[in-house]
Amino acid sequence: MKYINYMNIKYWVAALVLSGGLFTACSDDLVVGQVDESGYTTGDGSVMGYISDGNGKRMFTNVEFRSSGDVSFHLKTTGKLSSEATVSVVYDETVLTEYNSKYGTTYEAFPESEVTLGDGGIIKLPVGSVHSSELKVSFVSDGSLEFDKIYIIPLRMKVTSGDFKLGEEDQTRLIFVKDLTGLPDCTKYVDGKPGVKVFSCMEVNDTNPLNNLSFTLKSNGKPLVDCLIIFSANINYNAETGRVYIFNNENVQALLDNREHYLKPLQDRGMKIILGLLGNHDRSGVANMSKETAQAFAQEVKALCDAYQLDGIFVDDEYSDYEYEDITPGFVYPGREPAARLCYEVKKAQPDRWVIAYAYSTTGSLPAIDGMQSGEFVDYALHDYGGSFDLSSSYPGMPKSNMGLYSQEFNLGSTASESNLRSMRENGYLSHMIFAMDPNRSNFEWIQMSAMERMARAFYDDELVFDGIKYPKDWN
């Protein structure tokens, strides 16, 4: 990241024509994101209602499950009602048909026969309350679904009683579902609940990602690492065509081209594969695309993720030479709003994949876009090294469990204490990033290994096991 000298880039990204992709979000967050109700108004003074899932999300709901799973929904209103309010929820495949037609996607419906709507599909809001009890949507595996494919549970919501209105975006809901029955589960559970997710951000110019397989927990054999971030692809600008595009150096491209060898073994153990996106010393970057440019770039991101079966992106606003005057068409003055716009457009283009932000520079805090809080379209926010403050005001609507605290930089020996890591976990912050882990480096035994042993104890009350395998960089 900001301490790494990035190599010169030499190769264009390959043409991306494949389709498909891997699902990426988790339904097991422990702390519900808070929704800012101030933006939900009708303009005529009447009460507005909105539907959120158990993580406080209104925009998209993503879930992975094994054998069976469920998602809860709540009705909230901007004011108390004088009579009981009800909303009916039904499985309606036309919702998916409309979505596929609008966005040019080809998602398939999750079998209706395997979906159960609790309470007869009725959400009830008692008189004098602004928050309903939960409606649970449950689903089971029938053995027919492909594990590497996303399916949709399409729902339609309708007000059946009560003096309030549902916004248009709250009248339908797509649940993006991935059936992982029979596949390894990378999630580490502590006291029956999902524990900390470890994000391993690797500068792959000299490090083999297979090293993430070498570290497991003694009690269950699960990998210490939950997610690999490939650092990094680049955001570049072609002055002749006026196009912003993704540019991979020879090392990133080698891993993508040989994903069966370097990346799929991690996914087979349950890990996610995320591609970093970073500026590259020209006028383009995370924080200065116009709406139209961001929308076009988001489609390129989707094509790349489809082609290489990636699980999402990691945005990092560094190394861009932004224009602050005489700004080129297609760009805007750099700032937090265009950075948020890029994240929003990428999430809209591929809602089943993660958008992760490095909470640094312009992405240290992101505003709402088109009425949606940044915690709706950014799945995880990972602090800069050592950062430990709550990110709720920086990413409104994001669950605490998706905020990464006390990030560590192993190359320079910037590590976290066991007490800080344990405090993080105990306070519900369940995401953590390590950068530049590589057992082939000279500081492995006395810095990296010790740091990961502290992580195993603090996060999981467990012991770290190193299998002794050190994978070298073995591609040209």
What is each model feature region?
Residues 2-13:
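Bacterial N-terminal signal peptides that target proteins for export
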Residues 12-20:
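Sec-dependent N-terminal signal peptides
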Residues 21-25:
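C-terminal motif of bacterial Sec signal peptides marking the signal peptidase cleavage site
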Residues 27-85, 93-114, 118, 124-138, ...:
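Secreted glycan hydrolases and related glycan-binding modules that recognize and/or cleave
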